[in-house]
Amino acid sequence: MGRLRRRQEIIDHEEEESNDDVSSRRGKLSLAETFRWLDSSEHRRIETDGHNDYKYIIHPKNRWYKAWEMFILVWAIYSSLFTPMEFGFFRGLPERLFVLDIVGQIAFLVDIVLQFFVAYRDTQTYRTVYKPTRIAFRYLKSHFLMDFIGCFPWDLIYKASGKHELVRYLLWIRLFRVRKVVEFFQRLEKDTRINYLFTRILKLLFVEVYCTHTAACIFYYLATTLPPENEGYTWIGSLKLGDYSYENFREIDLWKRYTTALYFAIVTMATVGYGDIHAVNLREMIFVMIYVSFDMVLGAYLIGNITALIVKGSNTERFRDKMNDLISFMNRKKLGRDLRSQITGHVRLQYDSHYTDTVMLQDIPASIRAKIAQLLYLPYIKKVPLFKGCSTEFINQIVIRLHEEYFLPGEVITEQGNVVDHLYFVCEGLLEALVTKTDGSEESVTLLGPHTSFGDISIICNISQPFTVRVCELCHLLRLDKQSFSNILEIYFHDGRTILNNIMEEKESNDRIKKLESDIVIHIGKQEAELALKVNSAAFQGDFYQLKSLIRSGADPNKTDYDGRSPLHLAACRGYEDITLFLIQEGVDVNLKDKFGHTPLFEAVKAGQEGVIGLLVKEGASFNLEDSGNFLCTTVAKGDSDFLKRLLSSGMNPNSEDYDHRTPLHVAASEGLFLMAKMLVEAGASVISKDRWGNSPLDEARLCGNKKLIKLLEDVKNAQSSIYPSSLRELQEERIERRKCTVFPFHPQEAKEERSRKHGVVVWIPSNLEKLIVTAAKELGLSDGASFVLLSEDQGRITDIDMISDGHKLYMISDTTDQT
């Protein structure tokens, strides 16, 4: 219970409400700040939660209630001292003391009533409780009974009972009010405005005086328990000091009797009595033995506390020292009331749990330390040119990891050629950047004033310090460790690119940065290469969120790796449809070739990613293989029918020729591969095309002797001859030269803006331009094909069908728009 009560007192301790004169390491500052718990906006929200629902509930920090507490404290001191005296010296109070006693009991009765309306702090949740039922129940089960019985008019009850002696013993219940005095001293010890040594000595003196005062009253009471005719058998009745005798001591002046009893109690407690006052009867001897035994414990308590004061080793002393340092710090930095309340409240809670640390602010939670750092350092960091355009999250991470440092004029902070471990920001003062020449002389490069930084280029570019920094005036700097800075850049890499851009922009007006331009450019190149690898890695792993974050942060999605592969190549081969679509919308070239001549479409077809193939074909992707005929012939020779089917369905020309002018159908016919030959002719392969030796696929089939294959090719030949009545050479050329193009429904100048919102269409190139326009308009959902014209990528108008090559990108616009 004692520990819980002490915890309650620590938490409920009133914040400093008067002017404090606090000594700091940098001089004396006058702390004229009022700490009121309810004046803090954050604590007001927490503390008054539910207060408006109970209008008659009193907050424990209410100033009128605090005044009432001091008023009751005075009565508690009076009652604590007068109760033993009333018990020992009075059998029936005189009229003037009786009236005073009644007034005191009325005051305590009023205090009992008030206790039912005073909110309290819950020791488990640390929230203020305003609910009347909980307040009443808490008081009823704790102090109510003793407080209420203590207010009984025991003097009247004693007289009404016929002066029954046992009734007088109930007076001691009023000593329960001593707890108010004890609680007052506990609060006083934690009040950093009052000298701790003075507070402790005052408390120890009060303990000693109160114990001896109570013992003196009991000593006198024991003497009065014997009738007057036997008073010679008491310590005071038999007492004779010099020529003065204490016979008939009841008639001696009250003050003299009390002084004599107090003298007896004090010399007995100190065990230095000379025997002039001593116990006479058995009851007095028993009490003296008990009292002396108690005095040994009391003496040990007093000596132990005095020793603790001398060595300054108590928890309270350490707590007070820490509070003084904190108040000095908060005063010097002019922290707001809300932040002050959080800091002091947390330190008081740590003291209650006996938690200590030698480093100031180390005990404070990270969230509160972050608030302090943002309040103190954020205005400086925001003005540093190095961080111009950086995100708020990045700057906040920088701010909460800063450390303050002060340097005197003439001090060298960092020297030229040294490895840099810290990044510095100038808050106040002036520094000079110096370069040491080969002959040992120093040349001033620039001056560093407030809101500048140094050590940044060395850390970012991983080079030695290019110049020496020396203090010219008293400087207040903020230091950031290299490792912390590097860790932050690992997470906020896009802000790292912004920092590099800021450095490059500054080189135009800063000669010292111009000299380091090559190092900066090399580092930028390395960073871009690393960023490209990160983008490709995210695409390969299917990390859509990371990929989007990288590209949104400025990474180029068209950057390739060491094999020339773009993120689209990797996403296509892995089958990530969402990433593929996102990269297409970001403008990645769908026909970009890697070092092996493969496009994203080829990678998707090779891996059998049907969904990705559809997306790429819709966007006009093609294979663009330099030796497509040889590749198709090899595929047929391997017998990979599934791969061949995907190639043909994705738009690869089935009439592509190898170096011997052989088509894939030639190979299939010569090997007797019926299924693959059927697949090729269904895709439009020509049966009448001839190789360098003049052989057609049908000739190869006849040499192979596969009757089923021969019949298939003869039927196809007859069908092709009936459909195309022109010469076989023209038919062969038409089949071999079959081409396709991609038509987009917007102007070439709008390509970048419209690409992510409008899609084109891939169509076969017909025999004339009019058919192409009509077909494209129909596929694009345009109304009248005759009212449109086709433009090339360089905005030139297409006037003839022969101007269009295979894979050409065209742009369809209105004829009226073209004329304007």
From Swiss-Prot:
KHA domain boundaries: 740-820
Topology Extracellular: residue spans: 91-97, 163-168, 225-259, 280-285
GO terms, molecular function: monoatomic ion transmembrane transporter activity; outward rectifier potassium channel activity
Localisation: Membrane
Intramembrane stretches (start-end): 260-279
GO cellular component, as recorded: monoatomic ion channel complex; nucleus
Entry keyword set: ANK repeat, Ion channel, Ion transport, Membrane, Potassium, Potassium channel, Potassium transport, Repeat, Transmembrane, Transmembrane helix, Transport, Voltage-gated channel
UniProt note on tissues of expression: Expressed in guard cell-containing tissues, in root epidermal cells and in root hairs. Detected in vascular cells of the root and shoot.
Domain of life: Eukaryota
UniProt-listed InterPro entries: Ankyrin_rpt, Ankyrin_rpt-contain_sf, cNMP-bd_dom, cNMP-bd_dom_sf, Ion_trans_dom, K_chnl_volt-dep_EAG/ELK/ERG, KAT/AKT, KHA_dom
Biological processes per GO annotation: monoatomic ion transport; response to abscisic acid; response to calcium ion; response to cold; response to jasmonic acid; response to water deprivation
Domain remark in the UniProt entry: The segment S4 is probably the voltage-sensor and is characterized by a series of positively charged amino acids. The pore-forming region H5 is enclosed by the transmembrane segments S5 and S6 in the Shaker-type (1P/6TM) and contains the GYGD signature motif which seems to be involved in potassium selectivity. The KHA domain (rich in hydrophobic and acidic residues) present in the C-terminal part is likely to be important for tetramerization.
Description of how the protein assembles with itself and partners: The potassium channel is probably composed of a homo- or heterotetrameric complex of pore-forming subunits.
Job description of the protein: Major selective outward-rectifying potassium channel of the guard cell membrane. Involved in regulation of stomatal movements according to the water status. Assuming opened or closed conformations in response to the voltage difference across the membrane, the channel is activated by depolarization. Conductance of the channel is modulated in a potassium-dependent fashion. May interact with the cytoskeleton or with regulatory proteins.
Family: Belongs to the potassium channel family. Plant (TC 1.A.1.4) subfamily.
Protein name: Potassium channel GORK
Organism whose genome encodes this protein: Arabidopsis thaliana (Mouse-ear cress)
Gene that this sequence comes from: GORK
